[in-house]
Amino acid sequence: MAAEHLLPGPPPSLADFRLEAGGKGTERGSGSSKPTGSSRGPRMAKFLSQDQINEYKECFSLYDKQQRGKIKATDLMVAMRCLGASPTPGEVQRHLQTHGIDGNGELDFSTFLTIMHMQIKQEDPKKEILLAMLMVDKEKKGYVMASDLRSKLTSLGEKLTHKEVDDLFREADIEPNGKVKYDEFIHKITLPGRDY
């Protein structure tokens, strides 16, 4: 698996996310919710499934207390976490700034969809792991020593405990002092879990 396949491409256009859960787009501007048709549906499908959109709309509606099609910026982090994202306060602030929304502002559903898409895309576990491994593998050999990877996983970003790293290595069949090949490691730890 080549590294370039895991790195994100250009971000989607905001127009790609102007889609309500029912499949109809809305016209943005001065609070208008005038339908624009479903011509954007196929473009949206390449980013989010209809099931995801419906799930996001349901969560968004829980925080849209006035039922005006908007949620408070202060509710954004909680709404994102309810949907399985793990944004930091700094990431939430950057998302809001990107869309010109201050901490006391509001955001509509299409903006929420865009933010969720960008957050989920940036949280791609394969990408995160690859970037961590590339930091360790300065000579670009295609592998890192398990001890070096352990050091990075326990000291950077969302730090793992030594027990969590042990569990991760055990799951991926990695010896504590062995070599860790990118492709094999990423493949093993990102396989979907089995339902028993």
UniProtKB/Swiss-Prot annotation:
Swiss-Prot/TrEMBL keywords: Cell projection, Repeat
GO molecular function, one term: enzyme regulator activity
Classification via SUPFAM superfamilies: EF-hand
Record's compositionally biased regions (Polar residues): 29-39
Keyword Nucleotide-binding: no
Source superkingdom: Eukaryota
One Gene Ontology CC term in the entry: cytoplasm
Transmembrane segments: none
Residue ranges of every copy of the EF-hand domain listed in the record: 51-86, 87-122, 124-159, 160-195
Start-end of Basic and acidic residues biased regions: 17-27
Keyword Protein biosynthesis: no
Renumbered residue ranges of the record's region Disordered: 1-43
InterPro entries: CALM/Myosin/TropC-like (IPR050230), EF-hand-dom_pair (IPR011992), EF_hand_dom (IPR002048)
Gene Ontology process terms (BP): brush border assembly; microtubule cytoskeleton organization
Quaternary structure and interacting proteins, as annotated: Interacts with MYO7B; the interaction mediates the association of CALML4 with the IMAC/intermicrovillar adhesion complex. Interacts with MYO7A.
Task of the protein: As part of the intermicrovillar adhesion complex/IMAC plays a role in epithelial brush border differentiation, controlling microvilli organization and length. Acts as a light chain for MYO7B and is required for efficient targeting of the IMAC to the tips of border brush microvilli.
Family that this chain belongs to: Belongs to the calmodulin family.
Name the record gives this protein: Calmodulin-like protein 4
Naturally occurring in which organism (per UniProt): Homo sapiens
Gene that encodes the chain: CALML4
